């Protein structure tokens, strides 16, 4: 594992404009330093900085500008690719290369270096009064780059079925007030900016004003996971078991060619071989744009809604008690470890601050709708934390969960209505490979909400916690993975009525 750099100086030659070719060596050195430093601090303390080669590679020789070739990894072995397939690692490396280029240009031209910010966090929308809302967020400091702080924020809006976003304002603060005079779904992104450029957009949150002006429900986006596929090593076999856990691309992926087919370490050069079935397929990932999808299901019932990131709930910026019903989006959120685990466990479905906030809310009568593929197994499985199992049994109403590798992609509700969900790789919806099959807790008063198509495996339950406490609907088929909008609205309606009636 490690990074190699290649440049070409032509024994002290110059480019056509007179620039000395030694600048290519300087560029290579700066970028390699940046990659080495950032990867070591963020992912792998033992990441190696390998050689720099002054060689006549055509890609280094032909361009008439300072040029570098970066061989990020020594070769595509399993240890390398645990990082190489991870979208977060790719972002860190890509940002390191960008920062190295910016440093080179700043030094060469004698300019102040300012690095573009990271996306904002703790994004939330609050209804301040009828038709009036406030967007709030927080900047994300970059521990690797002190210059990357925002100096302003750009507010982007999408209305209804618009295909894209348009700018509606700028601010130097971390709040923005808006007025809504219709019952359309309005979606928003915040883009941090400074003299160095703009950050990636924030997650997308949404709102809708109910026609009758009634109190909105709260949609919480807890699906922040991006990751490479699951991996294993046991009994002479190793590799990526992407059929069991494909991982989650950032928005979409165009690099996947096919599932691994050769897992035997003894297979020599064939070890790690994969198919080519998906070489021309765009694979959908986490779009960070699901509150509007859930909101459309709520709107079909005539409901208004606001939305917030789970981190805003965890920080206390959003009070769940202000809302009669909370809809928690978990998608494919799951405890995840990258590489050797320097970053620890990330993307827990119910991190402790969120778990405690949900429990307080439910204990005081708040009703919960929770959808997520791993919503049960992540708090009952091997990576569960102290307090997780109590939460699972007493709030969710489950004591355990197993994966179901069904190929049908169909489930049905307690009325016998069928629903199709995304269970194959495609360019529209992320894949749901193995939804949790639920085991109800012995002391919980649960009823079945949904089963797989065969009717024998429970994937949804209603936990009746008693008259003084809130009701909980749990579905391990993510709502946004249901392919038909009318079907999404139907199952949301079923869950909503189940938790808000018979109290």
Q: Where do the PLM segments sit?
A:
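Active-site microenvironments of hydrolase-like enzyme catalytic domains
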Residues: 1-29, 53-76
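Active-site-adjacent mobile loop/cap segments within catalytic or ligand-binding domains
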Residues: 45-111, 476-479
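Short, surface-exposed beta-strand/loop micro-motifs that present aromatic residues
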Residues: 55-61, 436-437, 454-468
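Pro/Thr/Ser/Gly-rich low-complexity, intrinsically disordered linker/stalk tracts
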Residues: 103-147, 197-214
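Short beta-strand segments within Ig-like beta-sandwich modules, predominantly Fibronectin type-III
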Residues: 166-173
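Beta-strand-rich modules
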Residues: 177-198
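Aromatic-Pro/Gly-enriched surface loop or interdomain linker
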Residues: 203-325, 329, 496-503
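A glycine-rich, often tryptophan-bearing local segment used as a flexible ligand/cofactor-contacting loop or short
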Residues: 332-446, 450-453, 487-491
